[in-house]
Amino acid sequence: ESGINLQGDATLANN
């Protein structure tokens, strides 16, 4: 996975 998507993954895990 590219670094640009890591924050999006964390957000999805929190929701």
Curated annotation (Swiss-Prot):
The keyword Glycoprotein applies. It comes from the Eukaryota. GO terms for molecular function: D-glucose binding; galactose binding. GO terms for biological process: defense response to fungus; killing of cells of another organism. Signal peptide: none annotated. Keywords: Antimicrobial, Fungicide, Glycoprotein, Hemagglutinin, Lectin, Plant defense. The keyword Secreted does not apply. Glycosylated. Hemagglutinating activity stable when incubated at 65 degrees Celsius for 30 minutes. Hemagglutinating activity is reduced by 50% when incubated at 75 degrees Celsius for 30 minutes and is abolished by incubation at 85 degrees Celsius for 30 minutes. Hemagglutinating activity is stable between pH 4.5 and 7.5, but is completely inhibited by incubation below pH 3.0 or above pH 10. Homodimer. Lectin that binds strongly to galactose, lactose, D-raffinose, L-rhamnose and cellobiose, and less strongly to D-glucose, D-xylose and L-arabinose. Does not bind D-galacturonic acid, D-fructose, D-mannose, D-ribose, L-sorbose, maltose and sucrose. Has hemagglutinating activity towards human type O and rabbit erythrocytes. Has strong antifungal activity against B.cinera with an IC(50) value of 1.2 uM, and weaker antifungal activity against D.turcia, F.oxysporum and Colletorichum sp. Lacks antifungal activity against F.oxysporum and M.arachidicola. This is Antifungal lectin AMML. It comes from Astragalus mongholicus.
